[in-house]
From Swiss-Prot:
Gene this chain is encoded by: Cercam
Function: Probable cell adhesion protein involved in leukocyte transmigration across the blood-brain barrier. Does not express any beta-galactosyltransferase activity in vitro.
Location in the cell: Endoplasmic reticulum lumen
Keyword ATP-binding carried by entry: no
This protein's name: Probable inactive glycosyltransferase 25 family member 3
Family annotation (InterPro entries): Collagen_mod_GT25, Glyco_trans_25, Nucleotide-diphossugar_trans
Protein origin, superkingdom: Eukaryota
Originating species: Rattus norvegicus
């Protein structure tokens, strides 16, 4: 078998096949062939390098090259650009031709070597399933691709193609992409990562370059190969019956490597939530990270000690974004009893009921409130001018860090007086919210649910503590709207004065929950909890509240909850 890695060059002012060099340590992790294979060969080609791509490839080959029967290494270290390119990510005709020639060279080598199969894989395609090759080979199909997930609706296959070789929308795409139908399906095109069987007469006629003599479609490597398959009568399939891995959404021609790096970081974060996560290879050195607090005095992460997986995921996400944070052990509602609550001075706000289920306060909600309250106390005690507070179930939107930094810079420039800014929440009446003049990314916050992510000023923390909320407690996400006087229940508001918290919200939002009620992985330590004054230890799953449902008013940046722009080859 011949195993081909198409490693694109990357970094700084690199040209042609460019990917940020931080992709490579992750790409290399699972590129190990099944031990059952008798012989294998690894091949790699890079060009247009001005960063450490070549060094990283050589480092990886030095560690694992002995595992392969043959290693073919081709490197062109001279950096160069194409005369008519608009930017480092612009695919010119010359670039497409160069890529097709390299693919053809790899295909010819595989045939000469007597290989049974050849696997092509782009460096921004991450195979997290180490059984991918075995699963594809067992299908016994001439050309087959593992369906890869991405941050948007983009994937590595087309369900339809026009007679002129352009993309055609079909009714089958979304059910396939979303795995509403599972299996292996015949499609007109696969690209980026796919396996080609070299054991049939039909596939012997396949070629990347030169194009077929009758070829009149667009000059693009993936379309040229799709036409070659069609002309040779070779069926093409995509399989989505397993989670195989991920692919990064491409950037626009005028954008550069920094934007692609940002996209890839977001892909890593999505994989941490949805799984399986991407693991960096031990055989490749990763570029160093320099985490900071983004100009805040502190970044807090509230996390229960008995939820280590959620904590680890959150810290990994922040690390990938180079955000330095401190974990605050959340107060566990399961450890609370009446005597502890009495000692803390905790009492229920008279008349409080959940707005949907009608239940009373739960111990989980008490623990959540006390966790946030302890941070407010620390902010005041240490005189911290501004902080960020995260809960440990945050799904970050694309380019979270830069967007937050830009938002805070704009707030400072406009000299906005603020106490609290929601970064993630569930809006109840978004149509009533007013945009802040001079700050297009900010609105005056209305009644909202959730406290999964927000910024807080010293003045805001002082106002929250001054209201003495422990003596008349309600859930923290109900308390905050009371304090900025936007809660619809006047009886609740009557217990607090003044209600002058200056609260705003990012729009579009920068964060959302990792999961919602009804999702397979959803869990809640506030909804699955005993009533606040019940010491029996019984856990009740409260299903009546709609706060944790996936609501229509999230107002994230994209219709799917993601803010990345569709790729030209995207379904959208």
């Amino acid at each position: 078998m011949l195993f081909i890695i198409r490693a694109r060059a990357c970094g700084g002012d690199a040209r042609s096949w460019k990917q940020p060099d931080q992709l490579h340590p992750i790409l290399f992790t699972n590129l190990r062939l099944p031990l059952q294979l008798i012989a294998s060969s690894a091949g790699g080609a890079t060009d247009h390098n001005v960063d450490n791509t070549t060094g990283m490839l050589q480092e990886w080959l030095a560690a694992v090259g002995r595992d392969y029967a043959t290693v073919v290494w081709k490197s062109e270290d001279e950096a160069r650009s194409y005369p008519d390119e608009q930017g480092p990510k612009h695919w010119t005709r010359e670039r497409h031709q160069f890529l097709m020639e390299l693919k053809q060279e790899a295909l010819a080598f595989a045939r000469d070597w007597g290989a049974d199969y050849i696997l092509f894989a782009d460096t921004d395609n991450i195979l997290t399933n180490n059984q991918t090759l075995r699963l594809l080979i067992d299908r016994q199909l001439p050309v087959v691709a593992p369906m890869l997930d991405s941050q948007t609706y983009y994937s590595n296959f087309w369900c339809g193609i026009t007679p002129q070789g352009y993309y055609r929308r079909t009714a089958e795409y979304f059910p396939t992409k979303n795995r509403q139908r599972q299996g292996c399906f015949r499609v007109p095109m696969v690209h980026s990562t796919f396996l080609v069987s070299l054991q049939t007469e039909e596939t012997a006629r396949l070629a990347f370059y030169p194009p077929h003599p009758n070829y009149t479609w667009p000059f693009d490597d993936i379309i040229v190969f799709a036409y070659a398959c069609q002309a040779a009568g070779v069926s093409v399939h995509v399989c989505n019956d397993h989670r195989y891995g991920y692919m990064n959404v491409g950037v626009k021609p005028h954008q550069g490597l920094e934007e692609e790096k940002t996209n890839f970081i977001h892909l890593i974060l999505e994989a941490l939530v949805d799984g399986p996560p991407m693991m960096a290879s031990a055989h490749v050195s990763r570029p160093p990270k320099k985490p900071s607090k983004m100009g805040f005095d502190e970044v807090f992460v509230i996390s229960l000690a008995r939820r280590p997986q959620r904590r680890a995921r959150m810290l990994s996400s922040l690390w990938e974004m180079e955000i330095s944070a401190r974990v605050v052990d959340a107060v566990d509602g399961r450890t609370l009893n009446s005597s502890i609550l009495k000692h803390l001075g905790v009492d229920l706000l008279p008349g409080y009921q959940d707005p949907y289920s009608g239940r009373t306060l739960t111990k989980g909600e008490v623990g959540c409130f006390l966790s946030h309250y302890s941070i407010w106390e620390e902010v005041v005690a240490k005189g911290l001018a501004r902080v960020v507070v995260f809960e440990d179930d945050v799904r970050f939107e694309d380019n979270f860090r830069k967007r937050l930094e830009r938002l805070m810079e704009d707030v400072l420039t406009q000299k906005l007086s603020w106490d609290l800014i929601y970064l993630g929440r569930k809006q109840v009446n978004p149509e009533e919210e007013v945009a802040v003049e001079g700050l297009p990314g900010l609105v005056v916050a209305g009644y909202s649910y959730w406290t999964l992510a927000y910024t807080l000023s010293l003045a805001g923390a002082r106002k929250l503590l001054a209201s003495q909320p422990l003596h008349r407690m309600l859930p923290v996400d109900e308390f905050l709207p009371v304090m900025f006087d936007r809660h619809p229940n006047d009886q609740y508001k009557a217990h607090f004065w003044p209600r002058d918290l200056q609260a705003f919200s990012a729009r579009p939002l920068l964060a959302s929950p990792t999961h919602y009620a009804g999702d397979t992985e959803w869990l809640s330590d506030t909804e699955t909890s005993s009533p606040w004054d019940d010491d029996s230890g019984r856990l009740i799953s409260w299903t009546g509240s709609q706060k944790t449902l996936r609501g229509p008013y999230l107002h994230l940046a994209g219709s799917s909850g993601h803010s990345l722009h569709p790729h030209p080859r995207d379904e959208l």
